Amino acid sequence: VARKLGVDTVVGFTGSSIWPYLAMFPPVPASVIEAGFDDFATRWNPILDVFDGEGVRFAHEVHPGEIAYDYWSSVRALDAIDHREAFGFNWDPSHMMWQNIDPVGFIVDFADRIYHVDCKDTRMRPHNGRAGVLGSHLPWGDPRRGWDFVSTGHGDVPWEDSFRALDAIGYAGPISIEWEDAGMDRLHGAPQALAYVRSLLWPVPTASFDAAFSNQTTGDTA
């Protein structure tokens, strides 16, 4: 369907048979975790065969509940499928922030696997150590939470550094805004978020910024 629609990248989730073992207690044998990544490869290699056949890429969103949910699980997921080119990542920094993962470093280290970009923001609210990162079974927007999703540009994601990193790796794919904010009306927040993201999409230079000085120096000494 994606190919018929002219779409070359599909964003989605993989699922995970080992997510219930996240807490690692009771102790989980390493073999169980390894079997989980093997299960991922067994299920997804045939799917990726179809993607390859259609010339379409799959951009997995690094997200809790999935086989690749943070930095090292992303490394391991790629290893499990022998780094197939059909499989890459949807870079969504909102889920990295509350896990204390550097979203800019993720771009740099997975430069050839950033297939899609989701602009979604997170604001951290540690509350002097009262709230943890797992949400405390509190609903979105509850001020007691340790973090929450907010309109893009209103949180703690280092957006300028992130877009500079995307420019540096030559990213030219889709950029979408995934808007969530329990404390802001979407008809106000979504257009504001769009304007904010557009303000970061400046043209990259075609030459070194000091090239003009070099030319001037050359001209003076000619």
Locate the predicted segments by residue:
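Active-site beta-loop-alpha junctions enriched in small/polar residues
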Residues: 15-17, 61-65, 92-96, 120-124, ...
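Conserved, mostly hydrophobic/aromatic
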Residues: 2, 10, 40, 58, ...
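Active-site acidic/histidine proton-transfer and metal-coordination neighborhood
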Residues: 1-89, 220
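C-terminal helical cap(s) of enzyme catalytic domains, especially alpha/beta-barrels
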Residues: 186-207, 213
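Short, highly charged C-terminal tails/helix-capping segments
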Residues: 212-219
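Gly/Pro-rich active-site loop or hairpin
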Residues: 71-75, 79, 97-171, 184-188
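Primarily recognizes the serine-hydrolase "nucleophile elbow" in alpha/beta-hydrolase
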Residues: 89-90, 109
